[in-house]
Amino acid sequence: MMYIVELVRESLKKKTFNKKIFLELCKKLDIPIPQKLNKHNFPPLFYELIDKLKSLNIIEFCEITMDLHTITEKQKEILLNMVEHPINILIIGKGGGKDFMVSLLFNYMMFRACVEDYYEKFTRIDFVNVAPNDHLAKNVFFKEFKAWFLKCKVWQMIGIDKKKRQKAPICVLETKAEIGDKITMHSGHSRATSFEGMNALCVVADEISDPDFKNAEQLFEQGLSSAKSRFKDKARVVAITWTRFPTPNPRDDVGYRLYLDYKAVDEAYTFKGKTWEVNTRVSKEDFKAQYQKNPILARCMYECEPPELNAYFISLEALEARHKVEMGLFTWRAIYENNLIRLEFKQLQSTDKTIYCHTDLAINRDKGVIAISYFDKGKVIISDIIVLTPTLGHKIDYLSLEKFYNHLQNHFSVKFTFDRFQSEYFIQKFKGERLSKHVKLWTTFQELVEGTKEYYDATGVKRKKAKIEIRCNEDIWQKLRTQILQHQIDGDKVIYFGEGSPDLADAVVSSAYNCITHNVNAIDEEDYSYRQVFDDEEEFEEFEFGSFF
């Protein structure tokens, strides 16, 4: 028995069945309506309606049940292919109607799950949309889905309860919609979604290229495996996004990499299109201001095309070589309690070098980042990167930061710098300096990364090229690397082409700059012993350690 029969029986019993909508659908589908509806002629009329609705493709279904006649030709093409193919990788410019199309797909697939015999054997069927973060899950995607779900006359006919379940078989909650006890549509985010215990028929990875999407490719493959193992070729798994292109290698954009990898897969539909190619109600001219303000980001956002190589001011290969997963001076964690984020730390090792602590402060927006560095044997060592991430309910506890700074003063020779926001108290208390973002910081960092930064001994003799070593875990490194690469030098300006605030990059670059500028005349003890052996600088420059043996 079709599940929709159970739903209608329940709605008739609880008197939530909408006779007016039922007759309206019959009329739209040219089904003859008797003068008087009764218990004898209703069942055959109902089954005829369901048969006709089942025969509709997704475009016809939306036109009949939602009075939707504004789907563009390219959107129609994409929707028809999404229904046809088990795997869909869609790279579409921002404003192209991604959430709109996914919402229509969910509605259509949920209807199919209610009326096709294949699904009778399943006691539960799940539809899952995974967004990068909670805000996008609740306030962007689900808001769009909910609007079209409530407009669908099939669901209206059965009866919908809003906010909480009362009498109707269908209920729409804050981040999910329930059709009876069997079918549920979930809108979750990448940090909280698991397919364990789900019978996922349709999975959508929404904005999979967003750097905030945790374990994006892994989550997509898990969703694909989960859906295919249960529903085989009936499963529908979608990755849909506009591109970010965080590095010079286009394959470092997760969505774009999936698009390339699945192009040769027979059961996959892959598509890449500019905003105005998909949503023909807009043109490139409509985004003129965005192109003038940030042309590189606009090209990624609306055209889904990678930036030119010269858009990246720093060598990716050199930057990757500077990362080390090694123990820092501290171990730390963020404690979320009493509406505050408290920094908890423990010192693991020490150094007799002066350390340079830069803090990019925050309270309840962006991240609070502390970067610590010191100079040793010709290298700027970024030894520690501490990240505190506020939430809607938690602000950074500045008293815990003060405790940390006091510890640094008591156990190290330390110099403090801070960005210009929220920093006046700390600058005064710890005799710190304000360090604002400017070109010199970033060109110096580039020289350190690429090994072209020179430093000198105390007599002014050129020593060698200084380099940088960045010690942090893989999770912090991926975010830091992306933020660094999304900067560009334009004359006397530093431009950030990424989304949000580049707190990690700003803190690390500032700490490194402070460290090297205080050590341009550094001379290491190890180097000094060699310097005494060779008085001639040219001979010293060409000296190889192997000549000792």
Curated annotation (Swiss-Prot):
Gene3D superfamilies: P-loop containing nucleotide triphosphate hydrolases. This is Uncharacterized protein MJ0330.
